[in-house]
């Protein structure tokens, strides 16, 4: 399952379908959950006025977050292609109108976590999955600390999860200089600087993963209007928090 997903969606593999679509006009066939993921991308792309897009792939490559992890930005960084000019989303496929490199890092790992959770649920009454910060807890409840983005020995709070996912994003986790990290505004080709971390809880890891990225660009209110039944927390560069959470999330503020 993991190999098949990676072979389809990873832009870090030269033999993946995503890499193939960066060199030749092609379609990517979609399962229902993949279509749902790209629908959310499309809605958030519109809400963010183009800041959020899977077409950020070439921008990240040019910035140094590339296949070889060179972490050396090129002298010229391409701008992200226009969604309407480049892609058409159908229920069964993603149509490319011209070659382009996409990156589904905002939600792809979460989607894979959901698929693994579905597999485990068949035989395990209780289980938990931690895929580098994309967490799903099934069965019995678990308390998960929300790591402070500037001090790994501290937590800003605790979330109690039961048949839910928690995903966090932080600008310091995949950063390769004082100014470059992996959460980039496609309109300006610059990493987001006013938000340092976000967390989201949702019924699926894909939705929580997508929400945690979207919170770097949109307010919790807007994100929750698109990704419903989602709880969110944002920490800004001045240390202030904005949040909309239930009693299952305890914040130390």
Regions found by a protein language model. Name each.
Residues 1-253:
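Mature catalytic core of soluble alpha/beta enzymes
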